[in-house]
């Protein structure tokens, strides 16, 4: 590896793609992982009409497009669209030639093996990268927080997971994955806004609801008492202006929506909430290291950005854990991008340079090399 060439770090989330150069302290490009296709026939002669739009451009033209997310629950479901997103990342956002750089990609834990094999194949065969590596998202978040031991509760748009890490080793038997994350909350908010008489149905309108969610939702410390406050006064009501100037008011939806993270039964799911999952993850670990995990529980990902979520986690886990246990929930302010930041740190370490999968190794072994070289 030449020292002059910076590695590219691409954190392909289900909702947002974060990309940039190793050693930077923040991603240069952050755009929605969306591919949009026109839903109408073009009639203007001479206008350049594309058959697909990616990222922010798709978002800005969403009124005439059908929007699709190629990554669902952390797993790539449409590889052609995924290639478009990577192409857009390299050539339009970062403006680099991928064949000149090593590329670090991220993925959710407990993903199907074929997912990372295909990622590897596309990087080497379509984009001709010099070298690449795939890392687990939660592990990178822990790097970013400057720890080597801790439990990461990472929740993005497509998938949430709890990953206990001890002295830099992830403990695979204690990793829990929850297919309940930001996108499910957006859908749930669409549903409960319908009860108020506001109808949001199209893929474009879903993006409006996502914006409402990001701007106005919060996690209540005590759900029942928040509900009481909401029904007896209008102190919790907030208004939101839609793109057409119409103003809508939302009240208890503000905390009912993220409450589903703690009570998945709201979404008709039978799984445990994020607090129980975190606790179960710790309990699956060796009794000697639990204390360190309780004291170093790190939140990461966009769905942990709700105000009040850290206090609520503290309260819920304290109720489950032994009474004398010291519990500390760490919510770094940059946690929206901590996976990317961790990747940037990792890819710039001198000790990491022998870890890359080189083009030569790929040519000798094929895509399955990724399971041997990457944890």
Curated annotation (Swiss-Prot):
The keyword Chaperone does not apply. It catalyses: ATP + H2O = ADP + phosphate + H(+). The keyword ATP-binding applies. It comes from the Eukaryota. Its EC number is 3.6.4.-. It is found in: Cytoplasm, Cytoskeleton. InterPro entries: Actin, Actin/actin-like_CS, Actin_CS, ATPase_NBD. GO terms for cellular component: cytoplasm; cytoskeleton. GO terms for molecular function: ATP binding; hydrolase activity. Keywords: ATP-binding, Cytoplasm, Cytoskeleton, Hydrolase, Nucleotide-binding. Pfam families: Actin (PF00022). Belongs to the actin family. Polymerization of globular actin (G-actin) leads to a structural filament (F-actin) in the form of a two-stranded helix. Each actin can bind to 4 others. Actins are highly conserved proteins that are involved in various types of cell motility and are ubiquitously expressed in all eukaryotic cells. This is Actin, cytoplasmic. It comes from Styela plicata. The lineage of its organism: Eukaryota, Metazoa, Chordata, Tunicata, Ascidiacea.
């Amino acid at each position: 590896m030449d020292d002059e060439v910076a590695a590219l770090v691409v954190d392909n989330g289900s909702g947002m793609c974060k990309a940039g150069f190793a050693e930077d302290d923040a991603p240069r490009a952050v755009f929605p992982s969306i591919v949009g296709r026109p839903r109408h026939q073009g009639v203007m002669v001479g206008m350049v009409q594309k058959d697909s739009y990616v990222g922010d451009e798709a978002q800005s033209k969403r009124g005439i497009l059908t929007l699709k997310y190629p990554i669902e629950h952390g797993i790539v479901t449409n590889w052609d669209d995924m290639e478009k997103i990577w192409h857009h990342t390299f050539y339009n956002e970062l403006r680099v030639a991928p064949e000149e750089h090593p590329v670090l990609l991220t993925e959710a834990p407990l993903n199907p093996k074929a997912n990372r094999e295909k990622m590897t194949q596309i990087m080497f065969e379509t984009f001709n990268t010099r070298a690449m590596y795939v890392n687990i998202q939660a592990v990178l978040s822990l790097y970013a927080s400057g720890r080597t031991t801790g439990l990461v509760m990472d929740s993005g748009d497509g998938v949430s997971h709890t990953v206990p890490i001890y002295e830099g080793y992830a403990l695979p038997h204690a990793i829990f994955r929850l297919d309940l994350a930001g996108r499910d909350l957006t859908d749930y908010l669409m549903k409960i806004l319908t009860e108020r008489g506001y109808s949001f149905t199209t893929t474009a309108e879903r993006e409006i609801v996502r914006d409402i969610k990001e701007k106005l939702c919060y996690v209540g410390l005590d759900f029942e008492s928040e509900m009481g406050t909401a029904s007896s006064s209008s102190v919790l009501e907030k208004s939101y202006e839609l793109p057409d100037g119409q103003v809508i008011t939302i009240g208890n939806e503000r905390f009912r929506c993220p409450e589903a993270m703690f009570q998945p039964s709201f979404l008709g799911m039978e799984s445990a909430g994020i607090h129980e999952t975190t606790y179960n993850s710790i309990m699956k670990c060796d009794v000697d290291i639990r204390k360190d995990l309780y004291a170093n529980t790190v939140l990461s990902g966009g769905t942990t950005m709700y105000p009040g979520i850290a206090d609520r986690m503290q309260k819920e886990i304290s109720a489950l854990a032994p009474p004398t246990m010291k519990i500390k929930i760490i919510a770094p302010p940059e946690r929206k991008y901590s996976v990317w930041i961790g990747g940037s740190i990792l890819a710039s370490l001198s000790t990491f340079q022998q870890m890359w999968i080189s083009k030569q190794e790929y040519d000798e072994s094929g895509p399955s090399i990724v399971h041997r070289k990457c944890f």
